[in-house]
Amino acid sequence: MRPAPALALAALCLLVLPAAAAAAAYFGLTGREVLTPFPGLGTAAAPAQAGAHLKQCDLLKLSRRQKQLCRREPGLAETLRDAAHLGLLECQFQFRQERWNCSLEGRTGLLQRGFKETAFLYAVSAAALTHALARACSAGRMERCTCDDSPGLESRQAWQWGVCGDNLKYSTKFLSNFLGPKRGSKDLRARADAHNTHVGIKAVKSGLRTTCKCHGVSGSCAVRTCWKQLSPFRETGQVLKLRYDTAVKVSSATNEALGRLELWAPAKPGGPAKGLAPRPGDLVYMEDSPSFCRPSKYSPGTAGRVCSRDSSCSSLCCGRGYDTQSRMVVFSCHCQVQWCCYVECQQCAQQELVYTCKR
């Protein structure tokens, strides 16, 4: 077995958004443009030079406000790249056995519609950015933030003990400014996008834990230091996938008391006449999704997809059946997480039966 390089998707492509997107200043999987190749940023192999972050920010097709924020913070461009990468990895993992597998092909078409899959893209993109920013602060990669505000623990002391907490407070505050206020929009789709974005942020917040470490002679707990730590992003992805599975279809209604447009779920038999507003943790969508069985502007279809004969082939292959062949399969093994957003693996190989959907 030989070591494999860290997982990299689309040659470390960065998902970007158009410069003139003031009404929907999103980032990551919800960027409105096609993927743009983006070189490695300030890695150990190629350390960032002074002022290099300005060029990196200019390469990102951000809104004017976002570009200003990026240029003020030397560590932000790299963190944005990490967040896009993290969100894409998690999306593809959670939907690996689904007809829509978070393929980059068709992403632009999806973002123009109000499907459940679109809702997930907004949620996981916001969650990844929240997570990556909080981790970047605690890792000392950002100049304008540091560890979380743990009581009685200075940042320098925290780093000395190796207990620097993830700064979720700064992350969520920054993200609100970075994405811009959209809650007051009168457009139903914009309100749905904003709602799903906050579902993603909320999922990260719910995974914040208090971790403690003892200091003392021979392992005694004479002094105990506690700090805030985010749960692994895989757990956040699982929460959001569950929200996707139970997503609520909504329409719009005018709140007469407040005089504004709000999201409402359709009325159910025996329920309120006009339905109920979705809960803060519900993903919301407006249109029923296509089958994703055949190639379309939303996905490449499922022909040729590898499936599990005992579980996913029936649904994944859309009734077309599947082919069986024996081949040498190379797969990632002995994987180890490096910091927040990368996984280093070895490559293993073995002979096995592979099932692929017929065309």
From Swiss-Prot:
Gene3D superfamilies annotated for this entry? 3.30.2460.20
Carbohydrate-modified residues are: 101
Q: How is it modified after translation?
A: Palmitoleoylation is required for efficient binding to frizzled receptors. Depalmitoleoylation leads to Wnt signaling pathway inhibition.
Q: Which UniProt keywords apply?
A: Developmental protein, Disulfide bond, Extracellular matrix, Glycoprotein, Lipoprotein, Secreted, Signal, Wnt signaling pathway
Q: Name one GO biological process term.
A: uterus morphogenesis
Q: Where in the cell is it found?
A: Secreted, Extracellular space, Extracellular matrix; Secreted
Q: How does it assemble?
A: Forms a soluble 1:1 complex with AFM; this prevents oligomerization and is required for prolonged biological activity. The complex with AFM may represent the physiological form in body fluids. Component of the Wnt-Fzd-LRP5-LRP6 signaling complex that contains a WNT protein, a FZD protein and LRP5 or LRP6. Interacts directly in the complex with LRP6. Interacts with PKD1 (via extracellular domain).
**What name does the UniProt record give this protein?**
Protein Wnt-9b
What gene name does this entry carry? Answer: Wnt9b
